[in-house]
């Protein structure tokens, strides 16, 4: 289970996440994490949060982003806000380490589930070379966390009609939204911070 101080790594995407605030610790008000991304790391697939505002504070490096139709660069000290429901993606746009603090308001336990599972899959080498999940695994997880995140492709109508079927098939083949091995040591490190 993710809690304050939990640190999770995604070796396939070159990212590390350090949890600063959870749904439980903030009474559902704020999920906050520090993201560290190596140069050339994963470009986060375009997605939207149907019920949350997301805020990014650049701590170090060069933060590349696309929010709606606007592409930009954030530098240390910049704060970038993505309104509820607006499609966005992000990447390390510089030659060095990128560190951002990001916040989701309100906090949803499904966000914690998403990161725990996605980063766990990466640690086991189960992501595609692009950093995406395999189709059936993605359908299972994305159906479970659809209050937190919706990808922008395929279109929402296709997801709404097809993902329930794909998720059911995925569950029959053993895919899960939550794997207990990802939520207990050594899958996550509690740094006691």
Region spans (language model):
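Short acidic-glycine-tyrosine-enriched beta hairpin
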Residues: 55, 69-87
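Short, charged/polar surface micro-motifs in flexible loops or helix N-caps
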Residues: 27, 38-41, 62, 106-110
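Glycine- and acidic-residue-biased ligand/ion/polar-headgroup-sensing regions
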Residues: 51-63, 68
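Residue-level recognition of well-ordered beta-strand positions that form the cores
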Residues: 34-36, 62-64, 101-103
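A short glycine-rich, His/Asp/Glu-containing loop-to-beta-strand
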Residues: 9-46, 52
């Amino acid at each position: 289970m993710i809690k304050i101080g939990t640190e999770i790594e995604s070796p396939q995407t070159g990212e590390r996440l350090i949890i600063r605030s959870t749904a439980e610790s903030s009474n559902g008000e704020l999920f906050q994490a520090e993201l560290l991304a190596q140069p050339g790391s994963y470009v986060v697939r375009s997605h939207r949060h149907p019920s949350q505002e997301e805020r990014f504070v650049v701590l170090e490096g060069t933060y590349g982003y696309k929010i709606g139709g606007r592409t930009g660069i954030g530098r240390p000290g910049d704060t970038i806000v993505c309104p509820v429901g607006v499609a966005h993606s992000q990447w390390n746009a510089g030659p060095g380490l990128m560190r951002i603090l990001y916040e989701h308001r309100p906090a949803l336990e499904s966000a914690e589930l998403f990161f725990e599972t996605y980063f766990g899959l990466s640690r086991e080498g189960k992501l595609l070379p692009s950093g995406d999940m395999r189709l059936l695994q993605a359908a299972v997880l994305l159906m479970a966390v659809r209050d937190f995140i919706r990808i922008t492709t395929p279109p929402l109508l296709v997801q709404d009609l097809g993902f329930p079927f794909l998720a059911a098939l995925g569950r029959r083949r053993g895919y899960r939204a939550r794997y207990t091995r990802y939520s207990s040591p050594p899958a996550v490190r509690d740094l006691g911070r």
